[in-house]
Amino acid sequence: MVRVAVAGGTGGVGYAIVDALKAQTEHEFIVLSRTESPEYAAKNNVKVVSIDYSDVSQISKILDEHHIHTVISALCIVSKEHSDSQLNLVRGAAGSQSVKRFVPSEYGSAYEEKHALARPSTGLKAVAVKELAKTHLEYTSFVNGLFLDYLCMPTVPSHLAAGIRFFDIPSRTSVGIGSGTVPLVMTHTRDVGRFVVASLSLPKWENRSFIVGDRQSWHDVINIAGKITGEKWPSLRPSKSSGSHEPAHRAAYSASLKEHGDWFESGTFSSTLSSGSVYLNELFPEIIPSYGRRWPQDFD
């Protein structure tokens, strides 16, 4: 048994991790939040501890007071302010007497330095991993590919906010991603949470922990969508001109989306093991992704 603190537990991915923690009895946990969040605490029957992410010494004190062994960060990192909060959380954990393990807020693909340089939000997350490497803390980044939630909403419950990026389900259209033939990994946040919690019992962590809900090419995904809806979906191949896209996708198509297409093509989302990494599916064969191979049945 270890005591866990989930930072950002009221957000999308963090909420899914909290759900998984609530479903087990081996580990105790608290949720760290900038506010006391009484409604969230009552609804989920969890202990919420308010924390000031600008105060490293206070962070260390809170973690020690609650005898926290493992910190799981699920903070939303989209600005330097958010990134600084996570950096301070790392430093506070490193300065704590009780904390031994840390999970940075990654939950995506196996990004490298080139990705961090190309996409600001990826770079903002990467600094936490660099900071962790300087500490005595054992850490792992969870690599789960794309969130399958976006293909199953609203039929399958999710704590993620709905948004159009690659799909426009009502109009039966999809943005074209590269050649569409390269396999990519997709995992539902519910399953991410289950594997994250299972990993708490591992005697040793690798620096990267891979989770595979399903692996399909983008063409396969579009074909599945067409079979389910009974309509052929045209794939709208990205071009340098936003005028080539349907209206619903013009706002979605951006430099970020083009980068995703380039990264799809290079295999960034294929979740290929590298040195210092492990497939959690192999370590926990009893965990069968709820929305892996059967996700098409839940496509809305």
From Swiss-Prot:
Keywords: NADP, Oxidoreductase, Virulence. Its EC number is 1.3.1.-. Pathway: Polyketide biosynthesis. Pfam families: NmrA. It comes from the Eukaryota. Induction: Expression of the botcinic acid clusters genes is coregulated by BCG1 during both in vitro and in planta growth. One of its GO terms (molecular function) is oxidoreductase activity. It is an enzyme of class 1 (oxidoreductase). Belongs to the NmrA-type oxidoreductase family. Isoflavone reductase subfamily. Oxidoreductase; part of the gene cluster A that mediates the biosynthesis of botcinic acid and its botcinin derivatives, acetate-derived polyketides that contribute to virulence when combined with the sesquiterpene botrydial. Botcinic acid and its derivatives have been shown to induce chlorosis and necrosis during host plant infection, but also have antifungal activities. Two polyketide synthases, BOA6 and BOA9, are involved in the biosynthesis of botcinins. This is Oxidoreductase BOA1. It comes from Botryotinia fuckeliana (strain B05.10).
